[in-house]
Curated annotation (Swiss-Prot):
Belongs to the N-acetylmuramoyl-L-alanine amidase 2 family. The keyword Transit peptide does not apply. It holds the Pfam family Amidase_2. It comes from Bos taurus (Bovine). This is Peptidoglycan recognition protein 1. The keyword Secreted applies. GO terms for biological process: antimicrobial humoral immune response mediated by antimicrobial peptide; defense response to bacterium; defense response to fungus; defense response to Gram-positive bacterium; detection of bacterium; immune response; innate immune response; killing of cells of another organism. GO terms for cellular component: extracellular space. Innate immunity protein that plays several important functions in antimicrobial and antitumor defense systems. Acts as a pattern receptor that binds to murein peptidoglycans (PGN) of Gram-positive bacteria and thus provides bactericidal activity. Forms an equimolar complex with heat shock protein HSPA1A and induces programmed cell death through apoptosis and necroptosis in tumor cell lines by activating the TNFR1 receptor on the target cell membrane. In addition, acts in complex with the Ca(2+)-binding protein S100A4 as a chemoattractant able to induce lymphocyte movement. Disulfide bonds join 24-148, 40-85, 61-67. Homodimer; disulfide-linked. Residues 1-21 form the signal peptide. One of its GO terms (molecular function) is N-acetylmuramoyl-L-alanine amidase activity. Keywords: Antibiotic, Antimicrobial, Disulfide bond, Fungicide, Immunity, Innate immunity, Pyrrolidone carboxylic acid, Secreted, Signal.
Amino acid sequence: MSRRYTPLAWVLLALLGLGAAQDCGSIVSRGKWGALASKCSQRLRQPVRYVVVSHTAGSVCNTPASCQRQAQNVQYYHVRERGWCDVGYNFLIGEDGLVYEGRGWNTLGAHSGPTWNPIAIGISFMGNYMHRVPPASALRAAQSLLACGAARGYLTPNYEVKGHRDVQQTLSPGDELYKIIQQWPHYRRV
């Protein structure tokens, strides 16, 4: 009798696993971190094949309160100083292990120049990673976000991760973070 239920058990396990893969974890909404209203209107065509990882090269944040302030600072710089329609990144990663929604999955970013912005999601780690690595919680948050994006169809199943320095002349995402993302399974050199 237990053999009769074995296929059903496998189907149940598969469905539960799929549900877990689609869990986007802790994404802090724009409203929760106090974002200014976006003035962006250009949509990003999905699914997206590329993800560009950068760092803000700014202050570190390691608590939800400090990361919310840092996300506001980044947005302020992009909107007020650079004249952009919003924060340039689709998502920001805090050292508190949380993902902060920037432009999100559906809006064209301003993170990697005119060639890559229309075809890539931009994820930026808040902090400077030239000489130190982000904490494991931040790296896990980024990996979880990418798995979610692929599971929900925002990213192609064979999406490719690039470092910011792979697509533009820059030191971003910092030497130490760059070493780490080169080990990620979806990393591909240009």
